Amino acid sequence: MSSTPNKHADYPRLVADIGGTNARFALETAPCVIEKVAVLPCKEYDTVTDAVRAYLNQSGATGVRHAAFAIANPILGDWVQMTNHHWAFSIETTRQALGLDTLILLNDFTAQALAVTQTSSKDLMQVGGQKPVEFAPKAVIGPGTGLGVSGLVHSPAGWVALAGEGGHTSFPPFDDMEVLIWQYAKNKYRHVSAERFLSGAGLSLIYETLAVKQKAEPAKLMPSEITEKALNCESPLCRQALDIFCAMLGTVASNLALTLGARGGVYLCGGIIPRMLDYFKTSPFRSRFENKGRFEAYLAAIPVYVVLSEFPGIAGAAAALGNHLKNV
């Protein structure tokens, strides 16, 4: 008597998004089906292996053979030393300790880029532009704790995420005000990267610069407080800082779009923009994005999307694992 093969025989798969504070784990139980998401504080576990075992025990998962972890680190070989947590481990030794057939690691923003390929339209908010060109490159940029930058190019095997450190490219001031802000930062830091401004700490730096320029004592405000005061019209200085932040993001995003030829769209990830969607639609971002002289019409056609999905790192890890297993 013959039996029908189970096309999901290698499920469930373990996927994770590991940061310095929390590790988010989930099970992919079928293609693009993510279940049992759990957040574990990293400080409560001595090793990544301990955290994984705790999650598997908590979720009741059995028969897990394949796993992928997105992690806030460059992946340069077998040894991983987290820069913002004490966990350090060998990928191969961890695979063996967990009894897995497959364990792959990828940079967390590379995972976020891959997640774009699986994001549904309901989790995207378009800000200007027209329709994306099918199979054209896509640009992915994410201001948050830092500034993640990636791109997606299509190949016969599917979408490939470009792993780079574009957030650390030199920042290009656009006007006299941005030159003043750049000069203030240059006096504090040896290299003024795009990330110096396009991050939570960057918003605080812009605000600080404006306050000093006006010979005012800058209040000790968290980035979230600057944003809140700006959106509630409680502080003209905070509003100016947020306007400049969005304009700077427009410059950097359009530079990336031109570099990649990203007629497939520009995708904004990270934790900052989704907190101010109504404002962002009418912020200086889009006008600055298109302000490129002879290439204004080229950029005007490129759609920009704010990514709203809740766990893009986990979705991207699942996409990376699926791509890997197709090719082994």
UniProtKB/Swiss-Prot annotation:
Enzyme's top EC category: transferase
Pfam families reported in the protein's UniProt record: Glucokinase
Enzyme Commission numbers on file: 2.7.1.2
Keyword Chaperone listed: no
Positions with a binding annotation for ATP: A16, D17, I18, G19, G20, T21
Disulfide topology: none
Annotated localization: Cytoplasm
CDD domains found in the cross-reference section: ASKHA_NBD_GLK
Keywords (A to Z) from UniProt: ATP-binding, Cytoplasm, Glycolysis, Kinase, Nucleotide-binding, Transferase
GO MF annotation: an example: ATP binding
Catalytic function, reaction form: D-glucose + ATP = D-glucose 6-phosphate + ADP + H(+)
Cellular component, GO annotation: cytosol
One GO-annotated biological process of the protein: glycolytic process
UniProt family annotation: Belongs to the bacterial glucokinase family.
The name this protein goes by in its record: Glucokinase
